[in-house]
From Swiss-Prot:
It comes from the Bacteria. GO terms for molecular function: structural constituent of ribosome. Keywords: Ribonucleoprotein, Ribosomal protein. One of its GO terms (cellular component) is cytosolic large ribosomal subunit. The lineage of its organism: Bacteria, Pseudomonadati, Pseudomonadota, Gammaproteobacteria, Pasteurellales. This is Large ribosomal subunit protein bL19. InterPro entries: Ribosomal_bL19 (IPR001857), Ribosomal_bL19_CS (IPR018257), Ribosomal_bL19_sf (IPR038657), Translation_prot_SH3-like_sf (IPR008991). Coiled coil: none annotated. It comes from Haemophilus ducreyi (strain 35000HP / ATCC 700724). The gene is rplS. This protein is located at the 30S-50S ribosomal subunit interface and may play a role in the structure and function of the aminoacyl-tRNA binding site. GO terms for biological process: translation.
Length: 116
């Protein structure tokens, strides 16, 4: 039974997901339904957490919009995600960057990762 579930989950995994880590800045294009129309909406933010669970993997993006912090948890292999683009690689030492929630301005900056 579990082999069948694993096979079905393997078929539903997206193949075009780039590799990213906490601290990276991503631009995610998400399908948004408004009434009867569908359109793409871009959400750009810093990855503050990643949850690796195969088909159920998720990541949390954080951005500051008009002085208000906005966080969005997205399923990595969700059909509403059209594309993921890594804009900037950040150098951080932690896997979960929840401390960025309390910081603003220059203290919330993340250094750029050089090399790989």
């Amino acid at each position: 039974m579990s082999n069948i579930i694993k096979q079905i989950e393997q078929e539903q995994l997206k193949q075009n997901v780039p590799s990213f880590r906490p601290g990276d800045t991503l631009e995610v294009k998400v399908w948004v339904v408004e009434g009867s129309k569908r359109r793409l909406q871009a959400f750009e933010g810093v990855v503050i957490a990643i949850r690796n669970r195969g088909l159920h993997s998720a990541f949390t993006l954080r951005k500051v919009s008009n002085g208000v912090g906005v966080e969005r948890v997205l399923q990595t292999h969700s059909p509403i995600i059209d594309s993921i683009f890594v804009k900037r690689k950040g150098a951080v030492r932690k896997a979960k960057l929840y401390y960025l929630r309390e910081r603003s301005g220059k203290s919330a900056r993340i250094k750029e990762r050089l090399g790989n």
